[in-house]
């Protein structure tokens, strides 16, 4: 039973590797290049008479959601299963064949990752494809081809799986997208008023009650109309990085700032990215939003239809 959890003899093995990434070295946020990589090996990996020598296994990559970490999916959970325990049960019940499951760490100072390349965050797609996959194929007995390699994830991880299936079908044979970010007009746009309020707390000088006029011809307005930070985003980030605990509003604001850095990076802009809304008036900036929509899976299906057809499996 769930309440009396005991280690299972057929639960497989968890291995944690530490590796230093060349691709994440000197990333713009100063996030660590040294990363932990969780790997779950099924019971069958070591169980047969030759200690599994020679037998190779397919590999699944677990892309975690925003604010998540790969290793956390291996944590002990009372009254529930972690991902490794669930996989062990599914293999034991013959609902799934034995496979190696990999838990990459793609966490960033902006609270998470969409598993794509961004000049404002780092090249996390390259990190996965050019470093993590070859490392796993080198260290473990894998079936080292796209036909035996898949990725799955929820939320940001679902987005990552979808985009990887679209853009990088040479590396992946199947993808599973659980509640991945899509239809940006619907999911992101309505969330920005809260974010503009949170960022407004870091406006200098602070906003006072009373009549307020935004002068459309001012220098400040010109910069804000281009989605450039007037300092409040920088102050917001510096404040968030010092806090022990974020409020729900701050957490959502951090997420939206992370999405701006993901979808509209600009090395020449303050902080390395632009914002999709005018931070004083709250007006959507159509030129900036166009850049976001270039990353919306709903609008990319036709462009990447040939790659999607190459996949053996797509779960949405």
Name each model-derived stretch.
Residues 1-315:
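Non-catalytic cap/lid and distal C-terminal segments of serine-dependent acyl enzymes
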């Amino acid at each position: 039973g769930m309440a009396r959890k005991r280690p299972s003899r057929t639960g497989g093995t968890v291995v944690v590797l530490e590796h230093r990434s060349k691709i994440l070295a000197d990333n713009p946020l100063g996030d660590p290049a040294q990363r932990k990589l969780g790997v779950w090996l099924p019971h069958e990996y070591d169980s047969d008479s030759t200690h599994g020598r020679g037998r190779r296994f397919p590999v699944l990559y677990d892309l975690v959601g925003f604010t998540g970490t790969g290793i956390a999916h291996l944590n002990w959970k009372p009254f529930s299963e972690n991902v490794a325990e669930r996989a062990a049960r599914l293999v034991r019940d013959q609902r799934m064949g034995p496979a190696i499951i990999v838990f990459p760490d793609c966490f960033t100072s902006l609270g998470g990752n969409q598993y794509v390349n961004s000049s404002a965050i780092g090249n996390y797609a390259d990190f996965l494809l050019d470093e993590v996959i070859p490392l796993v194929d080198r260290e473990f007995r894998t079936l080292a081809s796209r036909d035996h390699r898949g990725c799955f994830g929820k939320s940001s991880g679902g987005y990552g799986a979808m985009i990887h299936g679209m853009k990088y079908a040479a590396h992946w044979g199947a993808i599973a997208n659980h509640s991945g970010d899509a239809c940006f007009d619907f999911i992101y746009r309505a969330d920005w008023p809260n974010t503009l309020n949170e960022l407004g707390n870091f406006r200098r000088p602070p906003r006072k009650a009373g009549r307020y006029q935004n002068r459309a011809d001012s220098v400040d307005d010109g910069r804000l109309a281009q989605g450039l930070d007037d300092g409040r985003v920088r102050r917001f980030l510096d404040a968030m990085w010092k806090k022990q605990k974020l409020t729900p509003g701050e957490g959502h604001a951090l997420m939206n700032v992370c999405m701006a850095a993901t979808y509209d990076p600009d090395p020449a802009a303050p902080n390395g990215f632009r914002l999709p809304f005018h931070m004083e008036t709250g007006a959507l900036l159509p030129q900036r939003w166009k850049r976001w929509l270039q990353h919306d899976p709903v609008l990319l299906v036709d462009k990447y239809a040939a790659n999607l057809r190459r996949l053996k499996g797509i779960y949405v």
